[in-house]
Design a protein with these regions (language model features):
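Core RecA-like ATPase module of SF1/SF2 helicases and allied nucleic-acid translocases
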Residues: 3-128
């Protein structure tokens, strides 16, 4: 199903389908390179959101060469990597949502809504 933005004006939401054998980590690294290097989006305007602490910690450990931080910190040259619930009540211009496909969650609909409503300008969802 296509995503449609109904809030303030911004970019059309993107939904990126993983190819067979491709990891969400690989796609996220390519997205960050595109956003920061090509589109000149400041790193602190980007947040990567995952459903669990395990997933967010995995991203922090494995995103090579990219400075990351938790949402309570504010360093302008770093991308935020956080769980959806930890990021609740905050927003960033660009949200990359990933790992929602790994399992069904008790309240998937509410969790997904919380995640997608954090983007003030551009939402990118990486799906399996």
């Amino acid at each position: 199903k296509a995503l449609t933005a109904i809030g303030p004006s911004g970019r059309t939401p993107e939904r990126i389908q993983l190819k067979p054998g491709q990891s969400s980590l690989e796609v996220v690294c390519e997205l960050i390179e595109r956003l920061v290097d090509t589109e000149k989006v400041p790193a602190h305007e980007i947040a990567i959101l995952t459903p669990t602490r395990k997933h967010s910690e995995l991203f922090v450990k494995q995103i090579a060469g990219i400075e990351t931080q938790k949402s309570g910190e504010v360093e302008l040259d770093k991308i935020i990597v956080e769980t959806i619930f930890s990021f609740k009540g905050q927003e960033r211009p660009v949200i990359i949502l990933c790992e929602m496909h790994k399992q069904e969650y008790a309240d998937t609909r509410r969790l997904r809504y919380t995640a997608i409503s954090r983007a003030s300008h551009h939402l990118i969802e990486v799906i399996e």
